[in-house]
A protein has these predicted regions:
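C-terminal motif of bacterial Sec signal peptides marking the signal peptidase cleavage site
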Residues: 16-19
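Bacterial signal peptide processing site
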Residues: 21-23
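Blade/loop signatures of beta-propeller domains
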Residues: 28-83, 230-237, 381-385, 450
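Short coil/turn segments that connect the beta-strands within blades of beta-propeller domains
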Residues: 52-53, 103-105, 151-152, 196-198, ...
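N-terminal cofactor/phosphate-binding cores enriched in small/glycine residues
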Residues: 61-180
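Extracytoplasmic beta-rich repeat domains
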Residues: 87-98, 127-148, 176-191, 208, ...
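Conserved beta-propeller blade signature
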Residues: 105-109, 115, 154-156, 200-202, ...
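Beta-propeller blade signature
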Residues: 166, 170, 212-224, 285-301, ...
Length: 464
């Protein structure tokens, strides 16, 4: 955890001290928001922490736990926190990025720029503009979710499918590589992951029928090392789970970052929806959509997979954060992967082999399945869904594509042993329809109407 302490300590103390010293006014521009005495106190506190630490990773660490051991901010003083500075990114698009903080510099991404900001003052150090074609296709809003730091280089993706290596001192591009073409619906929104000296990237585009993949890149040169397609072509393992030429436009996007276990040397990455969504009688499982993949970072070799929702019809993307931890299961300490899936079930997998250990509802209302069979690992499809597949009738389904949980990150505390997740309480009326593939057009094969309950539509939940 020492890789996050220095800069998080600074940020937390900055907020607390600015609140506590609210009465101390100053006209000095450098300390307009925080008194000089507070700055000196912060600097004294962080001086004991090594200079080379920071928030280097999306999710704070590569296990994606988002856990901080800091205790200064607690339920007794959290109400004192107030903003110390505000920085406008000059854009009205959604901001979903997680900043990085390295040696007092905060690195922030938006869809069309990368920023370096002095974390103490909010002063912009540099801004690197990203230009991309207006006709770039995106499913659900133009956004970017962050960058990653490795060996003194900043890596980020762009909406038009470029991977950039940036010099963190001035924001200039060291190298850039294109991963896919925009006319097929591909885009890139996630932060890259660096594992065993390989930069790994995923793509969005499942709603357009874009065939998903993961790429591995050399961090020094940008050389393309490997590609793993999430939809196998005929003759490849898993191709028997598709019919005819469905695989060509089968979806399987990889639009959120994965996690990494250095000891096992495995990258864990979730795969999203199949295209189109609609479920049909006689349809097969459609691997590796709605699955968790364990991949060797040097080669892209698939070691194991677990499919959460075979032949999914409801856009239950399995890309939600795969958090890594160790817990006791049936009296034995196990290295596990946990995920709050969009389909409304919370999963615990043995991350060495993909074996399902636990699966329970974490939202109140789940109607698409009656449960998960622990022996087979497969969902027990409800009678209402079986009838919908047979008749094509409009059916009330819970949860909706918003999921039991969507892309908002979950966290895990090894202190409490609990996971903390933002959850949804939204259903939909769903009708499967036939649809032919057309390049650059939404390819979902469904009509739907949201069901918004009178009671709260979302909750923060703690999950054992």
């Amino acid at each position: 955890m020492n890789t996050i302490i220095k800069n998080l300590l600074f940020c937390f103390m900055l907020l607390i001290l600015s609140a506590c010293d609210e009465q101390n006014k100053t006209t000095n521009k450098e300390t307009e928001l925080v008194p000089k005495s507070a700055i000196e106190q912060i600097n004294r506190q962080i001086s004991e922490v090594p200079e080379d630490v920071g928030v280097h990773y999306y999710g704070l660490e590569q296990n994606l736990q988002r856990y901080s051991p800091l205790t200064q901010v607690n339920d007794g003083n959290v109400h004192q926190l107030k903003p110390s500075w505000v920085l406008s990114l000059g854009d009205n698009r959604g901001q979903q990025t997680q900043p990085l903080v390295i040696n007092g510099v905060m690195y922030i991404t938006s869809h069309n720029a990368t920023y370096a900001v002095d974390a103490r003052s909010g002063r912009q150090i540099w801004k690197s503009i990203i230009q991309y074609p207006a006709e770039t296709l995106t499913c659900c809003g133009v956004t970017n979710r962050g960058a990653t730091w490795y060996d003194d280089v900043l890596y980020r993706a762009t909406p038009d499918n470029r991977l950039l290596a940036l010099n963190p001192k001035d924001g200039k591009t060291i190298w850039e590589k294109r991963t896919a073409e925009i006319e097929f619906g591909y885009s890139m929104t996630s932060a890259p992951l660096v594992a065993n000296n390989v930069v790994i990237t995923g793509v969005a585009g499942g709603e357009f029928g874009a065939r998903g993949f993961l790429d591995g890149w050399d961090p020094k040169t940008g050389e393309h090392l490997w590609r793993f397609h999430t939809i196998p072509k005929p003759g490849e393992k898993g191709s028997e789970s598709w019919q005819g030429d469905e695989w060509e436009h089968g979806g399987g996007p990889t639009w959120l970052i994965g996690s990494y276990d250095k000891e096992l040397d495995l990258v864990y990455w979730g795969v999203g929806n199949k295209s189109p969504w609609n479920m049909r009688e006689g349809a097969k499982d459609n691997l590796y959509t709605q699955s968790m993949l364990a991949i060797r970072p040097k080669t892209g070799e698939l070691i194991w997979h677990y499919q959460f929702t075979p032949n999914d019809g409801f856009d239950y993307d399995a890309v939600n954060d795969p958090i890594l931890t160790e817990i006791e299961v049936d009296g034995k300490q196990r290295k596990v992967l946990i995920q709050a899936n969009r389909n409304g079930f919370f999963y615990v997998l043995d991350r060495s082999n993909g074996k399902l250990l636990r699966a329970n509802k974490f939202v109140d209302k789940v109607t698409w399945a009656d449960g998960i069979d622990i022996e087979t690992g497969r969902p027990i499809i409800s009678e209402r869904v079986k009838n919908m597949i047979k008749t094509g009738e409009t059916t009330e389904i819970w949860p909706s594509a918003f999921g039991g949980k969507n892309l908002a990150p979950m966290s895990y505390s090894p202190t409490t042993g609990l996971a903390y997740a933002n959850t949804f309480n939204i259903g939909w009326y769903y009708t499967p329809v036939k649809q032919e593939y057309k390049k650059g057009v939404f390819y979902v094969g469904a009509k739907f109407e949201w069901i918004l309950p009178d009671e709260p539509k979302g909750y923060l939940k703690a999950i054992d």
